[in-house]
Amino acid sequence: MSSKLSKKKLKSLEYRSKKFDKKSQSLEEHEKKVQQKNEELEKKAADKISRDELPEKQLAQSNDKDKHSVSNPPHKTLKSKRQKGKNNDRKVILFVGNLPKDSSVETLQLHFKRAGQVPSVRIPTDKTSGRQKGYAFVEFINPKTDVISKALKFHHTIYKERKINIELTAGGGGKTEARMNKIKEKNRKWKEEMRQRVASEEQQAGEEKMARKAVADEGLESGIHPDRLRLLQ
């Protein structure tokens, strides 16, 4: 009986031993799994921190680029601003007719410089022969108040032994019907003013001539030289 009990005990002990070994193995595996999981969590946390830091670096780099672009703007941007400024300029273009065929930009600029501003000049030429067409366009950019009125007074002045004609054009401000009518009205008024000015100058010149003649006649009658008579008067 005792031998049988001992066998049972032995089997029980073997069973318990195997069970314990299994438990120990499962415990080790569990510890390994826990350790792996912790490592994975630590790795994820480190990746998240690096991802959070990356936008800050990128933002700092972006700010540096913005500062650089503000302090040193690209040439293209400056060019577009200059172009925009040019588009906002006020332009007044005069038509100049009855020009000789040997006209030049420089001599026309000198002729109109007396108005108070040097204009840009364009002299159209024939496409086939290359000869001048006998007229030009004189352009004033942002002219001062009295520049255009002075330039218009060069109408019928002499340029290279030619009496030139000057008129306002619709250039530089569009060619709408309202603007064209306005230009026509301005030209009409200006021509009327020119006619009155010429008549006034002719009248004044005639009066001065008559006055000189009267002085000369009086000098002859009195026996005194006309120049001396003017001084005495």
Curated annotation (Swiss-Prot):
Q: Which domain of life is it from?
A: Eukaryota
UniProt entry keywords in alphabetical sequence:
Nucleus, RNA-binding
- State one molecular function term (GO): ribosomal small subunit binding
Signal peptide extent: none
**The keyword Phosphoprotein appears for this protein:** no
A GO BP annotation: ribosomal small subunit biogenesis
One Pfam family, short name: RRM_1
- Residue ranges of every copy of the RRM domain listed in the record: 92-171
Q: Which PROSITE patterns match?
A: RRM
Q: Which GO terms describe its cellular component?
A: nucleolus; nucleus
Name the residue ranges with Basic and acidic residues bias: 11-56, 194-216, 224-233
Localization in the cell: Nucleus, Nucleolus
Which coarse location class describes where this protein primarily resides?
nucleus
Region called Disordered, residue ranges: 1-90, 194-233
Which residue intervals are annotated with compositional bias (Basic residues) in the record? 1-10, 76-85
Q: What is the protein name for this chain?
A: Uncharacterized RNA-binding protein C365.04c
